[in-house]
From Swiss-Prot:
Name of protein: Large ribosomal subunit protein bL12
NCBIfam families: L12
Disulfide links within the chain: none
Gene designation per UniProt: rplL
HAMAP family: Ribosomal_bL12 (MF_00368)
Short name of one Pfam family: Ribosomal_L12_N
Known function: Forms part of the ribosomal stalk which helps the ribosome interact with GTP-bound translation factors. Is thus essential for accurate translation.
Record note on quaternary structure: Homodimer. Part of the ribosomal stalk of the 50S ribosomal subunit. Forms a multimeric L10(L12)X complex, where L10 forms an elongated spine to which 2 to 4 L12 dimers bind in a sequential fashion. Binds GTP-bound translation factors.
InterPro entries per UniProt: Ribosomal_bL12, Ribosomal_bL12_C, Ribosomal_bL12_C/ClpS-like, Ribosomal_bL12_oligo, Ribosomal_bL12_oligo_N_sf
Parts forming coiled coils: none
GO molecular-function terms, A-Z: mRNA binding; structural constituent of ribosome
Family: Belongs to the bacterial ribosomal protein bL12 family.
GO-annotated biological processes: translation
Organism: Streptomyces coelicolor (strain ATCC BAA-471 / A3(2) / M145)
GO CC, any one term: cytosolic large ribosomal subunit
C-alpha cells in the first residue's frame, strides 16, 4: 500500500460526511486503543496559607448612557461622534436610555467617552 501524505489524508477527510468521520474516529480509537477526547488538566488543592490571587483586571468596558439630562441635543451630537451613528439612530439611543453607547472598549477609550458624554450633560456609567 502506498504511503499517503498528510495533505492526501486531509483531502480524503474533506470529502467525508460527518457520520463517516464519526465512524472513522470510532474505528481509529478501537484499532489503536486511544481516545480522541482532550486531556483535562486537574489542578491540585492550593497550598495552605497561599494568598488568593486577585481577580484578573478587566480590560474591556461598556459605556452606558443612563440619562440624557437637560442638553439632549448636545448628548446626541456626542453620541454621533463616538459611534458614527446617523442622527435618527443616535436620537433613538439617547431617548431609549439606559442603553450602551460603546461596548467592549479599552479602559482609556471608555473613560474618554464617559467624560465627553458627561461634558454634554448626560449621566453615564462605565462597567
Amino acid at each position: 500500500m502506498a504511503k499517503l501524505s498528510q495533505d492526501d489524508l486531509l483531502a480524503q477527510f474533506e470529502e467525508m460526511t460527518l457520520i463517516e468521520l464519526s465512524e472513522f474516529v470510532k474505528a481509529f480509537e478501537e484499532k489503536f486503543d486511544v481516545t480522541a477526547a482532550a486531556a483535562v488538566a486537574v489542578a491540585g488543592p492550593a497550598a495552605p496559607g497561599a494568598p488568593v490571587e486577585a481577580a484578573a483586571e478587566q480590560d474591556e468596558f461598556d459605556v452606558i448612557l443612563t440619562g440624557a439630562g437637560d442638553k439632549k441635543i448636545q448628548v446626541i451630537k456626542v453620541v454621533r461622534e463616538l459611534t458614527s451613528l446617523g442622527l435618527k439612530e443616535a436620537k433613538d439611543l439617547v431617548d431609549g436610555a439606559p442603553k450602551p453607547v460603546l461596548e467592549k472598549v479599552a479602559k482609556d477609550a471608555a473613560e474618554k467617552a464617559a467624560e465627553s458624554l458627561k461634558g454634554a450633560g448626560a449621566s453615564v456609567e462605565v462597567k
